[in-house]
């Protein structure tokens, strides 16, 4: 056995035995030669099975307020800064979202995330979202998560009282790349909201988008920055270049770079859910199973914020084909 393979096995066993790896070790794993990527992937899968068994977490999203966002994130087709021809709408009546939540539960989703395209909720909109959450709790009984932009302490505490389990707020990219991606708020603004959510007792979901034109080093920075927040869930999106956005001509990442991210994340956060999110069908096509055997143990199914996705039935079949449990 080669020295590199032996090292991967050693680090795998260290993680299984509860040892936290150093930043230099993580860098060594993340930048390993392509010929050892399969070994890295297998080790990440071993860690996943050890801590999570064969269960794959399935989540559905509801885009409860679409388009016309005030922020200028260059990847986003919902930004008011860009002409993307995406049809927008404001908050729908609660019964519409309740019906979506019920369908998600009946489909087999374990959680249902309310997502809104705005910088932060207004007082009135936040009250409306709270009514939606209350109705879902009464009539559906599915785990509710939220992604509502920036939060105040009071809003975070209110969500906790409403039994919201987890709050999503992505870092989007590494600190060093962020100023190229967004100018209407800062990286620290995003970290602040995550800390507010944590202090209110909410679980955290954070992550980012890979393939924004960042370097491999910046992807490494991103996963280290994510791990410092110790989120219960990590969501990794792969850019789908959207017409009308500044990144519409961006080249997609090679599968080997995507594997690096998921596999190394598992060494960093062995007990967290690591979720394959937006861009899965476009970027991976039939390679989604590879990521579920390379550190990932969750997916978003049945569509995204402005794009269709696989039906849960199809995703469940995909999961079962590799002897995992949906």
What are these regions (language model features)?
Residues 1-71, 75:
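Flexible, acidic/Gly-rich N-terminal and inter-domain linker regions that tether
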Residues 1-35, 227-326:
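Auxiliary Fe-S-binding modules of radical SAM enzymes
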Residues 3, 89-92, 124, 128, ...:
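Alpha-helix N-cap and loop-to-helix initiation/capping positions
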Residues 18, 44, 73, 114, ...:
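Conserved, mostly hydrophobic/aromatic
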Residues 50-106:
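Active-site cofactor/substrate anionic-group-binding motifs, chiefly glycine-
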Residues 81-100, 104-194, 203-207, 232-237:
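Core AdoMet radical
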Residues 118-122, 193-218, 236-251, 272-283:
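Conserved strand-turn element in the central/C-terminal portion of the radical SAM core barrel
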Residues 152-159, 213-225, 282-294:
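Catalytic cores of alpha/beta
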């Amino acid at each position: 056995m080669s020295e590199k393979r032996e090292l991967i096995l050693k680090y795998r066993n260290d993680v299984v035995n509860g040892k936290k790896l150093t930043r230099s070790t993580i860098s060594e794993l993340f930048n390993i030669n392509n010929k050892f990527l399969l070994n890295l992937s297998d080790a990440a899968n071993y860690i996943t099975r050890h801590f999570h068994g064969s269960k794959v977490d399935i989540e559905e999203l509801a885009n409860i307020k679409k388009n016309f966002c005030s922020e200028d994130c260059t990847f986003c087709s919902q930004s008011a800064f860009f002409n993307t021809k995406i049809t927008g709408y404001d908050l729908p009546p609660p019964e519409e979202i309740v019906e979506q939540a019920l369908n998600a539960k009946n489909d087999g989703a374990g959680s249902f995330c309310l997502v809104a395209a705005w910088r932060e909720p207004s007082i009135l909109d936040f009250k409306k979202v709270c009514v939606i959450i209350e109705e879902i709790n009464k009539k559906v009984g599915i785990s509710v998560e939220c992604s509502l932009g920036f939060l105040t302490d009071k809003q975070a505490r209110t969500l906790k009282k409403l039994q919201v389990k987890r709050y999503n707020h992505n870092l989007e990219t590494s600190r060093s790349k962020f100023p190229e991606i967004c100018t209407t708020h800062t990286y620290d603004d995003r970290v602040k909201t995550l800390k507010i959510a944590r202090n209110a007792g909410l679980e955290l979901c954070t992550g980012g988008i890979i393939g924004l034109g960042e370097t491999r080093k910046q992807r490494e920075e991103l996963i280290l920055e994510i791990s410092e927040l110790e989120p219960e869930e990590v969501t990794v999106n792969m850019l789908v270049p959207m017409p009308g956005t500044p990144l519409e001509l961006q080249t997609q990442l090679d599968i080997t770079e995507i594997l690096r991210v998921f596999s190394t994340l598992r060494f960093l956060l062995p007990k967290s859910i690591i979720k394959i999110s937006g861009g899965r069908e476009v970027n991976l096509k039939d390679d989604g199973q590879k990521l579920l055997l390379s550190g990932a143990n969750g997916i978003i199914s049945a569509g995204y914020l402005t794009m269709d996705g696989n039906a849960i039935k199809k995703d469940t079949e995909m999961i079962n084909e590799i002897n995992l449990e949906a």
